[in-house]
Amino acid sequence: MSQTHLSNQKFADLPLHPEVKQALAENGFEFCTPIQALSLPVLLQSKDIAGQAQTGTGKTMAFLVATFNHLLSTPVPENRQLNQPRAIIMAPTRELAIQIAKDAILLAKHSHLKVGIVYGGESYDVQRKTLDQGVDILIGTTGRIIDYVRQGIINLGGIQAVVLDEADRMFDLGFIKDIRFLFRRMPSADQRLNMLFSATLSMKVQELAYDHMNEPVKVEIAPEEKTSKNIKEEIFYPSQEDKMRLLLTLIEEDWPEKAIVFSNTKHSCENLWSWLEGDGHRVGLLTGDVPQKKRIRILEQFTQGQLDILVATDVAARGLHISDVSHVYNYDLPDDCEDYVHRIGRTGRAGNKGVSVSFACEEYALNLPAIETYINHSIPVSNYDRDALLEDIPPPVKIHRRHPAGARNLRERSGAGRPQGAHRSGGRPPRHDRTRRQP
């Protein structure tokens, strides 16, 4: 983590439970990020917060540290039943819930607290076995949690800490009725520690906070900056004919270590995957139609470096905590201005540098003025040399073709890695001999 991303506040200097301090130290957490430095002193006084921070600022660890500390420092409710978790963390997507659970397990190592996760797309029975053994911290999506509550498998009467993550996304996905349903089945707000985090604290999000929290303290981190200064943004105006060739050329020229390509529709994502797969890249596809187990496997492969490119709809734009994403490509400009911010927020995280490349094509160029108004700046325009675009592009593969197990043809991973300018056989010129930009 870059030192410029950290504050001067040390975790060791905060009045945290010894088991929490030990887990933080063992996992390399010494200094707080700004959102952690602002929120933890408030939360450690058992005061509720409504926090606003950009993605990648460490808010997940902020609420996890507060949750673990609160449970370890607070007596267990009298007559607590096995089906009563002590804390509940609600997330809008399965991917975010899974990532939160992974981070929670790091903190749980030295405590007696059990972490459980539930979400749709997986077997009820498998998840129920975990719940039947009792969990202290329940992490999940609202729909699956409600299913278990209605069946009596989960009872929320013993909740002592509540986290609502990505609250604005909850509104976008229509989950607010579910959230209110769950809040009504918990102890009153003054009997629990309540935490809400959101990329934006809109009026509707603040209303939700004040309805179900106990006089929350508002914590904000640089709300005026919707995009990180660590992200280099640029935009091209390709013709529809040039669009795919330009993307393939940019990827070969930039040669990103880890990239996400966003498109607006499932069909477009499948088309992108087919061309990238056909061009020899190690690429995964993440859309709403991909089965849950396959989605998890793809995310793990991407996180572990077995895939270099992830093609995704906006289902993956929020909540994915994947380190070292070097490039984000907006093949289509999103219709929603906030989606632009959340897409490019996948890179430039934790103080690292990132690159965002967007296409303002004939179909979606009309979205650009609203996006630039929303982010309060113009995106620098880059021109490209049409004669320098790739010509010898292999045909796309069919979507049902299984991903090859071998390494990406373009990149050699043995020894010192891919030599500069390495390329496929077939007469393609080295990447550094071709440039996309025009002076």
Curated annotation (Swiss-Prot):
Residues 425-439 have a biased composition (Basic residues). The keyword Chaperone does not apply. The keyword Cytoplasm applies. One of its GO terms (cellular component) is cytosol. It comes from the Bacteria. Its EC number is 3.6.4.13. Keywords: ATP-binding, Cytoplasm, Helicase, Hydrolase, Nucleotide-binding, RNA-binding. GO terms for biological process: RNA catabolic process. SMART domains: DEXDc, HELICc. Component of the RNA degradosome, which is a multiprotein complex involved in RNA processing and mRNA degradation. Belongs to the DEAD box helicase family. RhlB subfamily. PANTHER family: ATP-DEPENDENT RNA HELICASE RHLB (PTHR47959:SF10), ATP-DEPENDENT RNA HELICASE RHLE-RELATED (PTHR47959). DEAD-box RNA helicase involved in RNA degradation. Has RNA-dependent ATPase activity and unwinds double-stranded RNA. This is ATP-dependent RNA helicase RhlB.
